[in-house]
């Protein structure tokens, strides 16, 4: 079934933004297809998609991903009147501290990560726990293209065309017990292939961890992504499996997931543990609640530059208020930031 989320979630195929432009949180941490060939295009992709992905660098997609592309629901969810971020920006300006603190480190060091074979553990308060090879984990689900805004806590933003499937589909399949209230996610811990994990980042207790309330995780906008820009995820963008929660700040969208646990109590998360006064558990995009060191009322839409800063007003819930505000009825969003 094609998800139709009108009102605030619509966009044109020619209008997507590159994910390569992020401000650094080194202040906290440091203190302690150059043209896709026609044959490589996914099945059913027409002239609009060819033009849209003209700058995408071809990857080396695993067979399971290539097989699933033919049945992809293109533009299942879009945004309105906003440009898609250039692929090079989206893949060469990233926060992924497992590969280093600088924005270029993930692209420079990401090739060291081996994403095949890959497995995911699902455990905790579920009736059907298990360890799954990635190709088996994704097999039941049809890929959808979700064109989402991405808003970083550092006050920059982009628009990204993801390929993935609703997280809710996975959760329903593993059958949460009545005790399940939260979902906890964990990134791979592999210092041999993730140099940032063996460097001077003593402040981070690896592996990286994130969490959602169960009702947030079940919302149809929350997805597990395996691709972007019509191809598989590059390593620096969270290959081979990442979370995307578009109404929350980007650090909630955990990358390179190896474990999904359903739990009864609110899980500890990495950034909240490092600086709870700066990074809350909810991390909903909220222009009325500032970061202690900068305003969240406005954002730089990337790409931007000295003479074209491209600054705009930040929208509540990153523009998805119509869809998600009801999740937080009665919750003090200033206290629960």
From Swiss-Prot:
Cellular component, GO annotation: periplasmic space
Alphabetical list of Pfam families matching this protein: Oxidored_molyb (PF00174)
Subcellular location(s) of the protein: Periplasm
Chemical reaction(s) catalysed: L-methionyl-[protein] + a quinone + H2O = L-methionyl-(S)-S-oxide-[protein] + a quinol; L-methionyl-[protein] + a quinone + H2O = L-methionyl-(R)-S-oxide-[protein] + a quinol
Protein's UniProt keywords contain Metal-binding: yes
Alphabetically ordered keywords of this record: Metal-binding, Molybdenum, Oxidoreductase, Periplasm, Signal
Cofactor: Mo-molybdopterin
Post-translational modification: Predicted to be exported by the Tat system. The position of the signal peptide cleavage has not been experimentally proven.
One example of a Gene Ontology biological process annotation: protein repair
EC number: 1.8.5.-
Family per similarity comment: Belongs to the MsrP family.
Summary of the function given for this chain in its UniProt record: Part of the MsrPQ system that repairs oxidized periplasmic proteins containing methionine sulfoxide residues (Met-O), using respiratory chain electrons. Thus protects these proteins from oxidative-stress damage caused by reactive species of oxygen and chlorine generated by the host defense mechanisms. MsrPQ is essential for the maintenance of envelope integrity under bleach stress, rescuing a wide series of structurally unrelated periplasmic proteins from methionine oxidation.
Official protein name in the record: Protein-methionine-sulfoxide reductase catalytic subunit MsrP
Source species: Pseudomonas putida (strain ATCC 47054 / DSM 6125 / CFBP 8728 / NCIMB 11950 / KT2440)
Lineage, opening ranks: Bacteria, Pseudomonadati, Pseudomonadota, Gammaproteobacteria, Pseudomonadales
